[in-house]
């Protein structure tokens, strides 16, 4: 199991595994896991593809290809997922304004944050917060 993420709700977890990849792919999987771990830890930063490739001693085109091959996501999609997950945590556990949460998780533009959040959660951040409050009562 490479990593997992929750998008719609805590009960619906999607898992990404490497079981379909052959043994000679081990180094690709390790590289992708290291990059995914870095992105998960540094989700609020905006690293360029060139910076990521340099950090992990690889070519940006190769990194892009293997990341998508192993995870099924582009690097940008994976970073968005990490940011949305963190935003979900803040929306559930705090009363911080949505604008502040967007900035805290790495989105510079609140409208873009709301668009990405809606893409992965099928509801706006405000709707998500209200639904989580209703479920906990």
What do the predicted segments below correspond to?
Residues 87, 121, 137:
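Short Asp/Glu-rich motifs
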Residues 1-23, 27-31, 62:
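An amphipathic alpha-helical interaction segment
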Residues 130-137:
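Generic C-terminal helix-cap and adjacent flexible tail
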Residues 21, 38-84, 96, 102-127:
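Basic/polar phosphate-binding segments, predominantly the helix-turn-helix DNA-binding elements
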Residues 2-9, 39, 67, 91:
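Hydrophobic recognition helices of helix-based DNA-binding modules
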Residues 28-36, 80-88:
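Short, leucine-enriched amphipathic alpha-helices that occur as contiguous helical runs
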Residues 28, 57, 91:
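Charged, low-complexity surface patches
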């Amino acid at each position: 199991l490479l990593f997992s993420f929750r998008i719609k709700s805590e009960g619906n977890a999607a898992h990404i595994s490497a079981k379909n990849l052959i043994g000679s792919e081990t180094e690709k999987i390790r590289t992708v896991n290291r990059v995914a771990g870095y992105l998960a830890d540094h989700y609020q930063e905006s690293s360029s593809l060139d910076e990521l490739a340099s950090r992990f001693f690889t070519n940006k085109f190769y990194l892009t290809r293997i990341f998508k091959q192993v995870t099924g996501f582009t690097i940008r999609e994976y970073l968005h997922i990490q940011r949305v997950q963190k935003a979900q945590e803040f929306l559930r556990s705090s009363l911080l304004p949505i604008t502040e949460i967007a900035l805290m998780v790495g989105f510079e533009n609140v409208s873009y944050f709301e668009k990405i959040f809606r893409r992965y959660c099928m509801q706006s951040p405000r709707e998500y917060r209200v639904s989580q409050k209703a479920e906990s009562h």
